[in-house]
A protein has these predicted regions:
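Accessory beta-strand-rich segments of carbohydrate-active enzymes
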Residues: 1-17, 26-32, 36, 81-198
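Predominantly extracellular/luminal regions of secreted and cell-surface proteins
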Residues: 20-58, 62
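Surface-exposed, low-complexity/disordered Ser/Thr/Gly/Pro/Asn-rich loops and linkers
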Residues: 61-82
Length: 198
């Protein structure tokens, strides 16, 4: 996921990724076999796995082929160039909406949006367990109205309440291959890491 930000119509924004964010994320496979605590975002799956020591450098030797079972699923333990990913990956975090004096930023008159940009590629997004949308194209900016998924101040008073954000990268989501071509991997090159990991 890259550059998700919750933005109300008041002009307040809460960066959920990037250098201005203080929010911690967790990444895990759907079967619980692999867990990455505090992955750096924005980034990508392979970079997070490499930084956590779960995989070796995918650019070295045949690592991209011999380690594919980690991110693609256990069926990928072979030398076939093309195989379908079966393993889903889930990013989760919690965040709080700000309060100001006696007026909460969760008042019913405010509208909250989740803005998602540059996400590759098929992912379901949920807040507090409620599905709010699906992302299928890396080149599109998605804006989801999440007001109904966030409890209002009249329900919980003026104390900040934590909210859960879950992004599930599911290989069964139909997509059209709308992503940066150089990051897709080819028969002669692996996926491109999104940042310097030296």
């Amino acid at each position: 996921p890259e550059w998700q930000t919750v933005i109300p119509d008041t002009g307040i924004s809460i960066p959920l990724t990037g250098k201005d964010s203080s929010i911690d994320w967790e990444l895990h496979s759907d079967d619980g076999k692999y867990v990455v605590e505090k992955p750096h975002l924005p980034s990508d799956l392979l970079t997070n796995l490499f930084q956590a020591g779960i995989i070796d450098d995918p650019y070295l030797d045949r690592n991209f082929l011999t380690q594919r079972h980690v991110w693609m699923g256990d069926h990928a333990r072979n030398d076939q160039i093309y195989t379908n990913r079966t393993r889903s990956w889930i990013y989760t975090t919690t965040f709080e909406l700000p309060t100001s004096g006696n007026h909460s930023a969760r008042t019913p008159r405010w509208t909250w949006k989740l803005v998602v940009e540059g996400m590759k590629m098929g992912a379901h997004i949920a807040i507090n367990g409620v599905h709010i949308g699906t992302v299928t194209d890396q080149f599109l900016r998605y804006e989801f109205d999440v007001t109904q998924s966030l409890p209002t101040s009249t329900e919980y008073g003026d104390s900040p309440q934590s909210h859960n954000l879950t992004i599930t990268f599911d290989p069964t989501i139909p997509v059209d291959g709308r992503f940066t071509a150089c990051s897709g991997g080819w028969d002669w090159a692996p996926y491109v890491k999104s940042q310097d990991t030296q």
